[in-house]
Amino acid sequence: MNEAAARDIAEWRYPEEYSMYDFSGYEEEEKQLFNGLHFPVYEKEIGEFALVGFVSVGPAAQVVGRSSRKIYEDESATDIGLGLRPDLCGQGKGLGLRLVELAVAFVKSEFPDDNVRLTVAAQHKRAVKVYERAAFVKTEEFRKMMPGVNGKKRPCRFVVMILK
């Protein structure tokens, strides 16, 4: 992750129901963009390459908490996390699916024997549908307190999915 991409990603703002994915105001999360486990994704737009998303791999893609710790002890799977630029979400152009396929291809090239696992907030049905289209299946669920609007924590249900 280079500094310019990290700065751009840190400024992305999602609609309120997806705001848990904003980096803004969470300096620790912003620093994590430089931990070597986050990769910017560029796509050619109007003749030049533009930042369209990012992929996180391994521990950077896990939603760790008391109720999920056991799930991530299974080291036969490599975790992926995905972030699509907010203005590109929900447009029906298949960008989310392309990002998932890119992440899976990367993990499979680096760790061919590993399963591929991801974790998504259950209420984000649009993302769950994309992952299902990419051949992921739900395997487990857990709850974790997450930052909400105005910094108030709220319970959130997460779904763990494995690539078939």
Q: What is each stretch, according to the model?
A:
Residues E3, R7, E11-Q91, L97-V100, ...:
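Acetyl-CoA-dependent GNAT
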Residues G25-E29, F142-V149:
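Short, solvent-exposed loop/turn elements at beta->coil junctions and helix N-caps
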Residues G36-H38, R154-M161:
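Short hydrophobic/aromatic beta-strand or adjacent loop that forms the aromatic wall/cage
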Residues G58, R117-T119, T139:
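Solvent-exposed beta-strand sheet faces enriched in polar/charged residues
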Residues I71-S76, G151-R157:
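A generic structural micro-feature
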Residues G81, R117-T119, V160:
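Short aromatic/hydrophobic contact patches that present stacked aromatics
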Residues L97, A122-E140:
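Conserved active-site alpha-helix within GNAT-family acetyltransferase domains
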Residues P112, R117-V128, K144-C156:
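Conserved beta-strand-loop-alpha-helix junction that forms the acyl-donor binding cleft
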